[in-house]
């Protein structure tokens, strides 16, 4: 216990406090606190049990030293001896209780992980057995061979990479559009405020540099980095700019258009005037999705005109960074039908386990603070949709992603083996994990080779107070003003003052090692601060502890800790440390990667780093430093002293780092990245070739516009009266201008071509159109009211809502003319049509019917959606769109097995064939008490490699499973992408309760009217299990995009709510 005298004093005070066994603190008696022999007594020797000794042993073994120190300070602050004795007695047992609680939590954590691994093994066996049914005996043996461990990482990498063609200049003719997403933090290209808060750190720097580097690769035309737009007065105005150009890209000067290069695109979501922490952004992510979708569609059209020969250039890949952006990327990828890539950066399950082990917060407190369960679900959803997951290290794959339901290393190998043989995986899928270390921009790195000699930087730093000192970077002077002898080698640490960065242990190691103190200085770059009191509690606590340790060890003149630095100063800080022949250290408890280690190596600095995480791979690749146990301050001090004192070792580590640093360059990273993405199954919407380019569509639109002109000209006043619903809407188009445009088109064409005369003749006597009227709608009213009876049949209230919505919209003739209607329901088409017939509502009054919980989309009144018998058939392009990773039989068999009774009392569900279709497996719920929640079902399906969308619907009487890309909310985005109806121009009419997918529909840029009193109950109770994320993590509690009806179910009340939501949303 050398160097921890205060602990000895604390324990002696406990033992000398003259407490006795009769009190709550029981256990008198003195004795040596360092002797554990009296810590416990055999059972039955109750009078010999000494709780003080037992407490001492428990404290020494299980309580964090810094916490104990703070407690001791509070104790000795009391002057009155009697009060001090009482407080000491109480705290004695309080800390002992906390120590026991911590051990209990550790045991629970071990049991939880053990149970999870056991379940994973069982699931893996079941999945392998299911998959092996259609394999021959030889193939089964090959599959088992796939599960055998590979001898070396290098061999595994070569095997996986051998089938791919490395990206090269041969791809220069390609004009790719790449989308990167990083939602949270403050993101800009210049003067990045890294360290300003916990959301603006290394990830911001990483994504900005990745965007720049990717745009310079051959074949890449444009890179968009999406982030949140922040127009708060608390931050710089630049974060409110919609677009910021990062660089011109590799196509600059080639005359290929004006949109090439790399850009930051800022998308508004949530409160426009507030900068929100990432934990508060979850309810607004769907707004971000809709805003990003609108930009991508506009940009795709513009790029098509520039480099795509008139055909839209959709993103080559959509890449989400962190859990929130992974959630966004999954939805965008599904809406656009393009591949998705994920980089986790920091993972929620790993953080949850670490926080639980610390024992300072319960799981409920952790979730309340960090929204950890919503973050984990975002990561699971991103795994569902990802083609590729990029990690920095092998450790991240094995020890972090392995904790997730959606990834299993062994099952992934089995599925990959089947895919190579062309054998069906029955809808099971695991994303491919690849290690691609982050890159670094070396363009501004200046390495002075003269450091290898005996020269020093005396000329650079001498005479700071002289009349004409040699010019030096300002940050050098800021650092050296702390130091008595600035000529000593510098030990440099650069990180936020976060507890997990372990800065306090570094200061202790430096303070307690006299040879190290005499030989070197310590420089701590701990973010930026103005006032410690204004910092977050965790960061302030770390910084305060550091200052106290500096005072305790009297390190004044040996430790520098400047308050401010900017991004441009960071290379100069590295350069100063290298000139001083110093060492860079990263002592973090766990480091996912360690980008600062790469930066330090590029400037010629040897490194000392934690042995937990990414630094292991970095030191193996660069061979330029030492690894240490971050909990062992003696090991940290020894490693630093070894590098600083041994000149030959220092020079060798420096040379090795500079020689191998090219492995972490951005061009190398991007080349590997594009090679891997090229190996993904690229997909694009099939309908891009079909509409609206064909002649039939042009002719039909011309005729429809002509009829519109005649009709509108009769109904519009000379003043161009506007609809009351759109008075304040910036997206409103003046009908008078629209008429003028149509009349101009008519005048420009003196006569119809012969081929159009027959179409005109048919059009005058028929309501059938070749293409849906959706493509001409300016407004779309989506009725998604889940009104069902106890047996799951639609109630009359659903009909009443439909009729009143029609009356409300028709009351404004201008609005009705430019508006369309869609009915969105969990019912199959047959029951939907029966309901409409019952209410005498023609199906053709709807532009689209979304049926089967989003598994099918129909267009009544559209010729292309009618079969030979005149019956409606679903949109075939939509069915192709959602078929990705879908197996009807695999989902049906697995759900039936999971819902089967374990006690022999009968199954909880039976298949509902009438409600099922090729992309929807429907089950009738027989016993609601036996069914599992959506959370539980999703977890079990993911563990088996099945990626589906699960929902309970129709008053909890049905369980419906549809493809991952299908849902009622995603069907609306499909309509937006397919037919050009802006999501911002959609009005969703729904009830207070509904199916379990209602939450997904309430968020987004569309306007929502919630009709009170029409749904008494829904299926929401089956959404989540206890301990899961909350509804407020999905749906914003307050938003200008939603309004409630207040009175009876009447058209006037619905119109009032529509006007209200239009007015409030227009002010956003």
Curated annotation (Swiss-Prot):
Annotated EC: 2.4.1.14
Pathway this chain belongs to: Glycan biosynthesis; sucrose biosynthesis; sucrose from D-fructose 6-phosphate and UDP-alpha-D-glucose: step 1/2
Annotated spans, Disordered: 18-47, 118-139
Catalysis: reaction(s): beta-D-fructose 6-phosphate + UDP-alpha-D-glucose = sucrose 6(F)-phosphate + UDP + H(+)
Regulation: Activity is regulated by phosphorylation and moderated by concentration of metabolites and light.
Ranges of biased composition (kind: Gly residues): 23-32
Entries under Gene3D superfamilies matching the protein: 3.90.1070.10, Glycogen Phosphorylase B, HAD superfamily/HAD-like
Feature: compositional bias, Basic and acidic residues: 118-128
Keywords: Glycosyltransferase, Transferase
Signal peptide interval: none
InterPro entries in UniProt: Glyco_trans_1 (IPR001296), HAD_sf (IPR023214), SPP-like_dom (IPR006380), SPS (IPR044161), SPS_C (IPR035659), SPS_pln (IPR012819), Sucrose_synth_GT-B1 (IPR000368)
GO MF assignments: sucrose-phosphate synthase activity
Its biological purpose: Plays a role in photosynthetic sucrose synthesis by catalyzing the rate-limiting step of sucrose biosynthesis from UDP-glucose and fructose- 6-phosphate. Involved in the regulation of carbon partitioning in the leaves of plants. May regulate the synthesis of sucrose and therefore play a major role as a limiting factor in the export of photoassimilates out of the leaf. Plays a role for sucrose availability that is essential for plant growth and fiber elongation.
Alphabetized PANTHER family for the sequence: SUCROSE-PHOSPHATE SYNTHASE 3-RELATED
Quaternary structure, from the entry: Homodimer or homotetramer.
Family note: Belongs to the glycosyltransferase 1 family.
Protein name: Sucrose-phosphate synthase
